[in-house]
Amino acid sequence: MLMPKRTKYRRPHRVSYEGKAKGRNEIINGDFALVAKEGAWITNRQIEAARIAMTREMKRLGKVWINIFPHLAKTKKPMEVRMGSGKGAPDSWVAVVKEGKIMFEINGVSEATAREALRKAGHKLPIKVKIVKRGEEA
């Protein structure tokens, strides 16, 4: 699973996923990409599931770029613990994805294969996504 090697603070503040993405909203590496149509927190397990779905559909051909990384630690208090007594322990890691962010890019396979691989990856994510081709993103 993806997670940072080390962080400055163990329990960070929540980061909002409202609004549009400021950076990484154009295709840079691949020919096809998966773009977020809404904002959300994407967990490291969801990113890994999408990556596996893409590489299996592509039969290990081509190249995949993952442009999101789970930097944000989500905390959780144990079951049946009363309110208060500080913030909970880090539980999982999430990537903050805003609308318009390019999450995955693919290169080196046919258009039909790329679209099917990205469609399957989109089913693993908790948000609406759009498949775009280089030069057609906007």
From Swiss-Prot:
One of its GO terms (biological process) is translation. Part of the 50S ribosomal subunit. Pfam families: Ribosomal_L16. GO terms for molecular function: rRNA binding; structural constituent of ribosome; tRNA binding. GO terms for cellular component: cytosolic large ribosomal subunit. Binds 23S rRNA and is also seen to make contacts with the A and possibly P site tRNAs. It comes from the Bacteria. The keyword Ribonucleoprotein applies. Keywords: Ribonucleoprotein, Ribosomal protein, RNA-binding, rRNA-binding, tRNA-binding. This is Large ribosomal subunit protein uL16. InterPro entries: Ribosomal_uL16, Ribosomal_uL16_bact-type, Ribosomal_uL16_CS, Ribosomal_uL16_dom, Ribosomal_uL16_sf. PROSITE patterns: RIBOSOMAL_L16_1 (PS00586), RIBOSOMAL_L16_2 (PS00701). Belongs to the universal ribosomal protein uL16 family. It comes from Acholeplasma laidlawii (strain PG-8A).
